[in-house]
Each structure stands twice: as structure tokens, then as C-alpha cells.
Amino acid sequence: MDKGKSVKSTKKSVGMPPKTPKTDNNANSHVDNEFLILQVNDAVFPIGSYTHSFGLETYIQQKKVTNKESALEYLKANLSSQFLYTEMLSLKLTYESTLQQDLKKILGIEEVIMLSTSPMELRLANQKLGNRFIKTLQAMNELDMGAFFNAYAQTTKDPTHATSYGVFAASLNMELKKALRHYLYAQTSNMVINCVKSVPLSQNDGQKILLSLQSPFNQLIEKTLELDESHLCAASVQNDIKAMQHESLYSRLYMS
């Protein structure tokens, strides 16, 4: 091997900007990404998130979450463990892989998530939400998602909400930190709504919980940006157990 040639080649590759997904900017000239990211994270975006508690219902029925204080502790624990290392991290990784046009890497990330998710209800929930997110975007004919997103949509077998959202955000050149912030808030808001309905809590308590989570939100986003693929799916065993126990609850309001 020519050592001089090898060093020269390496220097060229260092510092190169990531590829940008090829989208027809003119086709989306009428789309305001600021409003679009609000739309896809809104509770009325029809992917069925409201039908899942992801194990929370078990905590409530077992009297582990009974009031505002225990609901807040549950949320902090869940957000800083399973949600961080699976949802937030996979969103970031698929976002970065989309910028690199690396479809194989994205499919590999989704396979790791599927194989690492022990509870059956959580696996099914991930797939349903991911598929529904993709199909809803495709049904919006005025929105040109670009060739890479379309190739991903046709190829993926095990999409999750977070991974498909990461591909979506990168395909439309949205800022990663903004995509993470909106996703984190929207999913936490869903959890709080579930607590308000099921514990139950007052609407005011729900808003107090969301307000008190602002500082942890910023910490979670910064932590996500620091993590790499080796941390993917560092799950909470306790939450997996509760999700499995949910399958045999006598009465259930949620599918997971």
C-alpha cells in the first residue's frame, strides 16, 4: 500500500459535510416546516398513540402510580431510561443515517429494536405506530417526501414511530435538535394525558407535571446528542416486566 496516498485520502474524508437527502425543494415550497412538525406531533395526528400506555396502565392498576408525585417520578424514570435509549436515540441514529443515505443502517437499527423489545405488546405497538406514521405521511399528497423516504417506506419491515420520524425529519431537512424537542414533548404529553385519565389526576396537576419536566427535557436532549449506537436499547427491565404483565390484566383501557 502507498502510505502517502492513504494519508492523503484520509485527510480528504475528514471534515466532509454529511450528505443531504435529495428532495425537490420546489415541490415543497408551499410547506412550512415549522407548522408541519407541529402537525405530525399533534395528538390528533392519526397514528393511534392514544390507544397505548406502554406499561403505564400496569403501574396504575398495581397502585405504583397513584397521584401527581408518583406520576412525576414514573415519568422521570421512564424518560431517562427506556425512552432515552430506545426512542430518542433511535430517532437520532436514523436521522443521521438518512443524511448519509444509508438505508441498510436504518433497517439494522430497526432490527435491533425489534429483537431487543421483549414484551409482545410493545413490539406490536412499535410496528403499528411506525407503519401508521409512514402511511399518514404518504396520504398527504401535497407533501413530497423525496426519493430516500419513499425507498425507506417501501423497504422497512419493522418501522417504529421514532425511527420513521427520524427519517421524516432528515428528509425534509429539519434540525435534529428541534425534531428531538418536539418528539420528546409530544410523547411525554401523551403519557401525562394517560395519567390524568387513568390515575386519575386533575388537568391542573397534568400541566404542573409538564412544567416541572422542562429542565429534565433539556438534559435528555443533550444526553441524546452525546450517545452513540452502542447505547441503543439499554432498556429498563422493570418497565419490560410491567409491559408483559399488562398482557394478562383483567381489565384494560389500552392496547399496551
Curated annotation (Swiss-Prot):
Organism annotation: Helicobacter pylori (strain J99 / ATCC 700824)
Superkingdom: Bacteria
Lineage summary: Bacteria, Pseudomonadati, Campylobacterota, Epsilonproteobacteria, Campylobacterales
UniProt keyword annotations, A-Z: Chaperone, Cytoplasm, Nickel insertion
Localisation per UniProt entry: Cytoplasm
Major location (coarse): cytoplasm
UniProt keyword Transmembrane helix, yes or no: no
Function: Required for maturation of urease via the functional incorporation of the urease nickel metallocenter.
Record text on subunit structure and interactions: UreH, UreF and UreG form a complex that acts as a GTP-hydrolysis-dependent molecular chaperone, activating the urease apoprotein by helping to assemble the nickel containing metallocenter of UreC. The UreE protein probably delivers the nickel.
Compositionally biased residues, Basic residues: 1-11
Name of this protein: Urease accessory protein UreF
GO CC term, one of those recorded: cytoplasm
Family membership noted in the UniProt record: Belongs to the UreF family.
An annotated Gene Ontology molecular function: nickel cation binding
Region feature (Disordered): 1-28
Gene3D superfamilies from the UniProt entry: Urease accessory protein UreF
